[in-house]
Amino acid sequence: MLELKWDGKDVALKTAEKIPLRLLDFDSSLSHGEKNSGNIIIQGDNLKAMKSLLPFYRGQVKCIYIDPPYNTGAAFEHYNDNFPHSDWLSMMYPRLEMLREFLSDDGAIFISIDDTEQAYLKIICDEIFGRDNFVANFFWRKRTAKSDVPHGISQDCEYILCYAKSESFHGSIKGKERKYFLTEDFPNRAWRYHDLTKQTTAAERPNSFFTIVNPKNGEEFPAQVNRTWAITMETFKSYYEQDRIIFPGDYDFLKISKPVLRYWKDDDIKKSGENFGMVAASTFLPADVGMSQNGTKEITEIFGEKKFSFPKPSSLIQHLIGIAVTTDKNSIVLDAFAGSGTTAHAVLNLNNVDGGSRKFILIEEQPYCNTITAERVRKIGGDFNFYRLGEKISDSEGKINPKVTFEQLAGFIWFSLTKSPYIQTEHSPLIGIHNGTAIYLLYNEILTRNILAMLPKHDGAKIIFGSACRIDDDFLKENKISFRQIPKELSL
């Protein structure tokens, strides 16, 4: 397989695994709306944030969209877009490796890029996701042509690379609704019709080169030499007996000049299942996804001023994530380069269109994470919990970092099991009950029978986090206790 080499790649290959697990500190003052919405915005380095999220969301994200720096050499106000080439590759590689771990087996990632690094990005994505999992390279027209450009050629398009986690991914979009008819002869069974010819020659399909005769009036419809029927004579007879052949004149509202084939709506639904009404997505994105100017206009309308350079229009991101999640209304969408928060906007828009309850996870390192990324979501009425990256959970010896308080560790554990923030009411080893299971934190204590006897009582299942356990497995099983050693098992 083709492999891309650059100075620093050996270090980049080991970067992700060396990132320590960190706390995620909940900030209620910057959160908005329902605390159990499942939507999350995290301020912090995206590689560190993803490492801390991975124990909770590994294999659960249906769609990832990222808009990383393009490495164009431009100096944008809000982010660095001027990496040396090898540094850009070393920045992207571990992040793509970690993003792959988030994807569900039927999930996909979409990556915006331009000509500067597109070819190199394709090669490293082939390495990370597998060449066989390359889905498509979408073309997005970002602007109309400019005249003042190098070499007299206006680069008006950008690209969106799409890779699947596995062959289980199937992308599609909502198509224009097919027109079905209810008629007097079939008042309870809707139908549509389709062309009965095929673009093949008589030499290619001799069995389909015949004359169809209308049994009701004897009118003849011969096949064309360069366009035969799509069926054989035997199939025609079978379809006619099933009321599937429609002739000119059968229905006054149908303006047809040759026989067509009837399809029943209930058969379409049965065949398509949850994909009924869906069509294949084209790599040529439709004009209604908008251009860069639409993204800028959107930001200006929300904030009353241009707060961000070159934001993508939410209609573009909505179209892309729709390819992956239109038929899954409860999926999770992740954006690790959140920027102005367009991905959250797109998820909320898609939910408004079809009544879905998809969740978003946004990660943004820059200070504007609150003032632009999160504020945009607040202004459009989205609910989310706001987190910041906190302390490392363990020290160099693998022990709990002494800077980590009981409350902080309790919050991390509670989030890991419930995906919701920990609201402390009192200092107790019983940090909460979730779905009938009591969750205990002993911090640096060892679980013994004496310690167990002192814990707040709970009749159901128990998960107990501690530094070690001195109770035998049979007793734990008999008392519905699952022990988890910290910090080791926090990342499992």
Where are these regions (language model features)?
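Mobile active-site "lid"/loop adjacent to the S-adenosyl-L-methionine
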Residues: 62, 69-91, 104-106
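Generic enzyme active-site microenvironment
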Residues: 43, 65, 69, 112, ...
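Accessory, often C-terminal, charged low-complexity segments
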Residues: 1-22, 26-33, 37-39, 47, ...
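Basic, amphipathic juxtamembrane/active-site segments
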Residues: 74-88, 346-366
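Conserved SAM-binding loop and adjacent beta-strand
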Residues: 304-315
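Conserved proline-anchored active-site loop of SAM-dependent methyltransferases
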Residues: 59-74, 125, 333-347
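Short acidic, Gly/Ser-rich segments with clustered Asp/Glu that frequently serve as metal-coordination loops
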Residues: 46-49, 71
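Conserved beta-strand signature within the Rossmann-like core of class I S-adenosyl-L-methionine
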Residues: 107-111
